[in-house]
């Protein structure tokens, strides 16, 4: 994460934590400590004060944006003289591995669902659209999992296009972090929510990032509001290693885990393994594919140590 520069100054309004928290106004805190415990990710220490200072103002901003979109829809309906299918407001959340995208998405889902104007809020991750493990092996992409070419982008765009068109029932594949693969014969059904949150590494990509296929639509073409969760790479690497060490004694210990062999590593060897995975896969993916999309986001959440937000950048 670079410090605010000329591009940031030209494109974004910058808010320090105290400034941003003041934009909450009278939005009530609807989550308890028990609720938050269920939403936290591995190795994250997000507190209720973080929800109050950062996420409540953000939920207010999103509620205002959803309301404005709904009003524009009503005006268009009146002009056209008919009522089109219900189309969800789509929010995307991008950022590096280990930055806390999933926790951000779950907290926003919980908060936004308490607004009476849009009580039905669904959440999906793009992980389900990774090619199956067998296909990744066939294509020689196993060591590039998470890179843009490891996703079935055609299926992902068809999914979000159907959502945006107001299709009543749209299915998405489900991914297992235990087996490191899609779950066979299981799907997540999206049935015309008021809001759909889509979380993934590459959801801000455009044709500029795919020179061999610039004309096809991208996920970002269908998104109403985009968020990028940002942090310095040294923090990201540390969080990834810390998470890996926790998985080693947790999820990896299951015999069904694709990474079960890592559970037998000692601390030093596990740390070295995680560091190597970061340096050869996650770090390069961040540098080449994820970080260059940051300035396309409508809002950037910048994290400091302990996953605490220290600045919010809102596009002008």
Swiss-Prot record:
Binding site for ATP: 95-102
Record's GO cellular component terms: cytoplasm
Swiss-Prot/TrEMBL keywords: ATP-binding, Coenzyme A biosynthesis, Cytoplasm, Kinase, Nucleotide-binding, Transferase
GO biological process: one example: coenzyme A biosynthetic process
UniProt-listed Enzyme Commission number(s): 2.7.1.33
Classification via Pfam families: PRK
Keyword Transferase on entry: yes
One Gene Ontology molecular-function label: ATP binding
Primary site of residence: cytoplasm
PANTHER family in the record: URIDINE KINASE (PTHR10285)
Matches recorded under HAMAP family: Pantothen_kinase_1 (MF_00215)
UniProt similarity note: Belongs to the prokaryotic pantothenate kinase family.
Protein name as annotated: Pantothenate kinase
